[in-house]
Amino acid sequence: MTSHPSFTAARLRRWLLALACCSFAALAQAQALPAKFDATRDAAADVRTAVGLAKAQGKQVLVDVGGEWCIWCHILDKFIATHAPVKRLVDENFVVVKVNFSPQNRNEAVLSQWPKIKGYPHLFVLDAEGRLVHSQDTGELEAGKDYDEAKVIAFLEKHRRAK
């Protein structure tokens, strides 16, 4: 009888260790995605990582294409960070990956698989399998010198993963 409880304890320890390893792996992958546009990043690898995270987390992928040179890219980043309803929708429904477009790195191999971009930033929504769901010209989401919260929320709600 004493072997049965220790067997259960051993199984529990293995299960907890496996859970901890998975948690650390997911955290490491999430931290591996760029927080800003970086010409030195491997965009294809970043998109693959984002798709893997989206699949594991039941989310869509929001591919944000732009560059550090792009004023509207920074305006969009600030807009998302400072508008709680928008930030909540993004955080709860999307894995965000930034793909650089600049003279140093146009990331043509990655970007050529999706529709042409007219301006920056540009957003692509991918499903958890990496398939294109939507291509969004962010100019359509603007209002004056900022973004329109209602338009951004409508875009995010329309393209989040059905639950």
Range-by-range predicted roles:
Residues 81, 86-106:
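Thiol-based oxidoreductase modules, predominantly thioredoxin-like and allied folds used
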Residues 15-26:
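Bacterial N-terminal signal peptides
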Residues 118-162:
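Non-catalytic, surface beta->alpha helical segment in thiol-disulfide oxidoreductase systems
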Residues 67-81:
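Conserved redox-active cysteine motifs that mediate thiol-disulfide chemistry
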Residues 39-59:
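A short beta-strand-turn-helix
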Residues 28-32:
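Boundary at the C-terminal end of the N-terminal hydrophobic targeting segment
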Residues 57-68:
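Short active-site neighborhood of thiol/selenol oxidoreductases, capturing the structured segment around
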Residues 2-17:
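Bacterial N-terminal signal peptides that target proteins for export
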